[in-house]
C-alpha cells in the first residue's frame, strides 16, 4: 500500500511519453544535465581562494565596491 511497484512506474512512464513525446523529454533531460553541470562548475569556482583568481576579477570587485559606496553617499 505504501510504495509503488515497478509496474506502476512503467505505466506512469508510458503516459508521460504519450503526453510529452520523446523529443521534449530528451531536450528537457539535456537542459537538466547542463544545469547540473553549471551548478557543479559554480561550486568548484566558489571553493577557489581569491589568490588564485586573476588580477582582472579583483579590479572588477574593487571598482564595483567603489561604485556601491558612491551610490550610498547622501546628496
From Swiss-Prot:
Part of the twin-arginine translocation (Tat) system that transports large folded proteins containing a characteristic twin-arginine motif in their signal peptide across membranes. TatA could form the protein-conducting channel of the Tat system. PANTHER family: SEC-INDEPENDENT PROTEIN TRANSLOCASE PROTEIN TATA. Belongs to the TatA/E family. Residues 40-75 are annotated as: Disordered. It comes from Stenotrophomonas maltophilia (strain R551-3). Its main location: membrane. It is a single-pass membrane protein. Pfam families: TatA_B_E. This is Sec-independent protein translocase protein TatA. InterPro entries: TatA/B/E, TatA/E. GO terms for biological process: protein transport by the Tat complex. Keywords: Cell inner membrane, Cell membrane, Membrane, Protein transport, Translocation, Transmembrane, Transmembrane helix, Transport. GO terms for molecular function: protein transmembrane transporter activity. It comes from the Bacteria. The keyword Cytoplasm does not apply. The chain crosses the membrane at residues 1-21. The keyword DNA-binding does not apply. It is found in: Cell inner membrane. HAMAP family: TatA_E. GO terms for cellular component: TAT protein transport complex. The Tat system comprises two distinct complexes: a TatABC complex, containing multiple copies of TatA, TatB and TatC subunits, and a separate TatA complex, containing only TatA subunits. Substrates initially bind to the TatABC complex, which probably triggers association of the separate TatA complex to form the active translocon.
Amino acid at each position: 500500500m505504501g510504495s509503488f511497484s515497478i509496474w506502476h512506474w512503467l505505466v506512469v512512464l508510458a503516459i508521460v511519453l504519450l503526453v510529452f513525446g520523446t523529443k521534449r523529454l530528451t531536450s528537457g533531460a539535456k537542459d537538466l544535465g547542463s544545469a547540473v553541470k553549471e551548478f557543479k562548475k559554480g561550486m568548484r569556482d566558489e571553493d577557489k581562494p581569491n589568490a588564485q583568481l586573476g588580477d582582472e576579477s579583483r579590479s572588477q570587485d574593487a571598482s564595483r565596491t567603489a561604485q556601491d559606496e558612491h551610490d550610498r553617499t547622501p546628496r
